[in-house]
A protein has these predicted regions:
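N-terminal glycine-/serine-/threonine-rich phosphate-binding loop
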Residues: 1-32
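Glycine-rich N-terminal segment of FAD-binding domains in flavoprotein oxidoreductases
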Residues: 26-52
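A glycine-rich beta-strand to alpha-helix segment
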Residues: 30, 38-39, 43, 119-144
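Short beta-strand segments
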Residues: 33-37, 65, 102-103, 130-133, ...
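A glycine- and small-aliphatic-rich helix-loop capping segment at beta-alpha/alpha-beta transitions
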Residues: 46-57, 80-82, 144-154
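Ligand-binding beta-strand-loop-alpha-helix segment within the catalytic cores
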Residues: 56-129, 246, 251-256
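Class I SAM-dependent methyltransferase SAM-binding "motif I" and its flanking Rossmann-like core
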Residues: 136, 140-185
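ATP/nucleoside-binding phosphotransfer catalytic cores, i.e., glycine-rich phosphate-binding loops
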Residues: 186, 190-257
Length: 257
């Protein structure tokens, strides 16, 4: 892992965009994995800004979302396909049909999940995946206790995740779906590179477990320790419980002189 710790969320977004542009310059038709939630919002805004400035084109890009709720209407504002279109896809030149997400509405959810996993493989795999983290250490909707080798599957959302996400549903946990379709940890690990973003004190325990703890089902994001290309971008609050924070800062500074 390459770990950067910063005071400014705008700087985090800029650095994350820099990494994605590196991939774009090497491969203009790259495959982009997209996360939802609050963590990547500034990154997506920065990518839109750079598109408008002529620094990147999404004309040859295909995207694959990490996850989708089950049980929401297709046009629900908080549906993840709608989130991605609203915050990125509809604001750049990505062609119609190039943005993909898990199907949370099909009659056979498990078959749909397996088909999504195969679609990613058929498209050559994800070149760079954007990731955030839940307060319980989940990535995608891979909750604690699941297998570390899972593929895209139907999952059950924990009470903690539903409480965390209630802020997107007028604070009402009863409006938050109980199920989802999510890329599995094995699917996520197949991505060639990752950009991981975490901000805020509420993520500090999960960040510490992911980086400095053992690899365990209790903290699903810890599996990223086994991936060869993960760029971790944190603010001071999210990094506040890291015992080796000063070391990570020193290494980052020396590598980015």
């Amino acid at each position: 892992m390459r770990i950067g710790i910063f005071n400014d969320e705008d700087q985090i977004a800029s650095l994350a965009a820099d990494r994605i542009l590196e991939v774009y310059r090497a491969k203009p038709n790259f495959v982009l994995g997209l996360a939802t939630g609050s963590s990547p919002l500034k990154l997506y805004a920065e990518l839109v800004r750079r598109y408008q400035a002529g620094q990147i084109s999404f004309a040859q890009v295909r995207s694959y979302n990490l996850d989708e709720y089950v049980g929401l209407p297709r046009d629900h504002y908080e549906g993840y396909a709608n989130f991605i279109h609203r915050n990125l896809v509809d604001l750049v030149d990505m062609p119609e049909g190039a943005a993909h997400g898990p199907d949370g509405w099909c009659d056979d959810l498990e078959a749909g999940a397996a088909a999504y996993d195969e679609a990613i493989k058929a498209d050559g795999g994800i070149d760079i995946q954007v990731l955030g983290i839940g307060s319980d250490g989940h990535i995608g909707f891979n909750e604690p206790g699941g297998t570390l080798a899972s593929r895209t599957h139907v999952g059950v959302l924990t009470e903690q995740t539903r409480r965390d996400n209630a802020r997107f549903f007028d604070g009402d946990i009863d409006q938050v779906p109980t199920h989802c379709v999510t890329q599995g940890l094995g699917t996520i690990m197949d991505s060639r590179a990752h950009i991981f973003i975490a901000t805020g004190e509420g993520k500090a325990d999960a960040v510490k477990a992911m980086i400095e703890g053992g690899v365990t089902q209790r903290w699903p994001a810890s599996i990223l320790q086994h991936h060869p290309d993960v760029t971790v971008l944190l603010d001071e609050a999210a990094a506040s419980k890291l015992e080796l924070a000063d070391f990570y800062k020193e290494v980052w500074e020396k590598e980015h002189l």
